[in-house]
Amino acid sequence: KALELKIDVKTPISLKNEEFVSYLKSLEADLFIVVAFRLLPKEIWKIPRFGTINLHTSLLPNYRGAAPINRVLINGEKETGITTFFIDEKIDCGKIILQERVDLSENTTAAQLHNILMHKGSNLLENTINLIEQNKVNSINQEKELAIKEAPKLNKELTRIDWNMEAKDIHNLIRGLSPFLTEKENLKDVSICPSAWFNLITENKKVFRVKLLLSRFTKQTNNKILSIETDQKSFFKINLNKGSIFIEKLQLAGKNAINISQFLSGNKLNEKWIIS
């Protein structure tokens, strides 16, 4: 898109490349803006006369790190937000300029939250730039809380569902990794939404690798843990510790995403099937 708009695009192998640093200095920029990028060397973020600002998708100081969108949902938070701040030597620790809060439902997915914050973030950045331009910024130091929640990078081990977890935690993992936007659209960026997955084994020992895109949680606990319930038409329920989850949308390896009724129409589940 930048190339279409005839905006210069540079892709240096190293951010400390002398030619790249010289190019940035030649711009004589008032301000640099960073979104979803790794740590910048000081020799770069100190170049502009007003410094360098970052847009972060959490309410700092909580959820510093690479995966704030996912981690707030996986942890079952009821609120998150976005923050603009001045970059300094430490990751996501600079002085806060502006913040905006966003309420979360118990079913918000990572893809949905990504899009919400993307749109709100553009407005917050515009407001931040205006404040800097008008010399009206009253930035504040980040609070030095004793128990700050972190947002480390996602890893492959996290994405596989551990069925020994409580039902609500599994539901939060599913939505915290889910690309589901609407019934007709999924976010395609797997770095943001890799999907939680498990193996479903038939009574004939056929193994389906299943990515879960959408689930619903219920506190109902009067059934055998790890048992499966289905009407073979419209619902697929897995009974778990402290509740159950209904699978509403899934994706088999190498296939397109489908809703549960489509899956059940071609697969006759019974109590002999195993989740792993």
PLM segments and residue spans:
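N-terminal glycine-/serine-/threonine-rich beta1-alpha1-beta2 phosphate-ribose binding loop
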Residues: 1-30
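Short beta->alpha linker loops
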Residues: 15-16, 64, 165
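Residues at alpha-helix termini
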Residues: 4, 26, 74-75, 266
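Donor/substrate-binding cores of folate-linked one-carbon enzymes
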Residues: 29-161
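Internal anion-binding site segments
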Residues: 145-276
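Short beta->alpha connector loops
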Residues: 13-16, 37-39, 218
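Well-formed, non-transmembrane alpha-helical positions, independent of function
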Residues: 1, 23, 43-46, 72, ...
